[in-house]
C-alpha cells in the first residue's frame, strides 16, 4: 500500500460521548478520514473529566479516544444550531456515527430516515446500548452493565466467590471496532450502488458476540459453566499457576502440548494416566489435575519454568504489570506506543495494525472544546 491513511477523502461526523462511538471515530480518523467530533457546548463529552490523570486540564482518557479529530460544539436545544449541523452533514459527510440514547437524534430532526432521504449516499451508524429493537431498546447502557447483563461477569472470578468484571472497557472498545467494520462494509456497498444506508451496532450485541463459545456450548449441552478463575471451561490446563516468585500463565491447549508439558515439569507419567490422557478426560478430572500441577509449579521461580516450557514449545507467559509491558522489548520493537512531540506532549497506544510494515502515525491530538467552530460550523450557517 502506498499510504497508511487509506480513508483519506472521507468525512465522518461523530456525535459521540464516552467510549464506543469516540473509539470508532478515532480509528477512522487515524486511518485518514476527516472526523469532526460534535459536542455539547456546556462541558462537552463527559470523558473530558475522566481522570486523573489529566494532560493540560483534559483527561488522558479523552486524548486516547479522541485523537485524530476536529472538534465543534452544537447545542441540540437550539434549532438554528441543529439546522447548521444538518447542513454540515448533508454537504460534507460520508458517515454519521453516534451513540446517543435511542431516538434522541429523531427528536432533533436528525433521524436516519430524514438524513438518508436528504443525502442517499450517507452511511448513518447507530451505536446503541441494547440494540435498535426489543423491550430494552430505550434503556441506556454502559460497559459494566453489559458485562453483567450479557453473562460475561458470570464467567469471571473464582468459583464460589463474587463475579468480577474485565478491568478495561472491553465491550465499549469492541463495539467501536464492530462499528468501524460495519461502516467500512457499508461504504464498500456504496461503491457498487451509490447509496449509503443505516448501520446498527450495540454494546449488548457485542457482549453476545464475545460470548460465542460459552453460549454455543450451553445451547449444545444445557449446562451453565462454572467460574474457573484464570482458566476456561473447555481446556485443561489452560490457566495461571503460582510459582516460587509469582504467577505465570500456562496454555497446554492440545493433548500433544500436555504430553510435552508433563515431560518439561518432570512428570511424564501424568500424560499416560487414563484420567488425564485426553483433554476431555482432563476437563472431567480438573479438580484432580490442577492441584498436582499447582504443587509442582510452586517449587521453582518463573524464569526456571519459562526456560523449561519454552524449550518444550509450551505457550507460557509471566503476568506482567503495566510498567513491565510498556518497557518490554517486544512492545518497543512493534513501535505501538507513539509519542506526540508537540503540545500537549503525549504518549498513547497507536492502532494495532500496520500496512506493508508501516503503522499509521499519531495523526493529531484530541481537540479542545469547540476549537474548530469558526472553520467548520460557521461555514454551514
Predicted regions: what they are:
Residues 1-11, 226, 242, 322-381:
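Terminal low-complexity tails and localization/encapsulation signals of metabolic enzymes
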Residues 35, 310-324:
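Short, well-structured beta-strand/strand-turn elements
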Residues 176-196, 209-221, 262-268:
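Oxidoreductase and adenylate-handling cofactor-binding alpha/beta cores
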Residues 236-312, 316:
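Aromatic-enriched alpha-helical interface/lid elements that frame and gate functional surfaces
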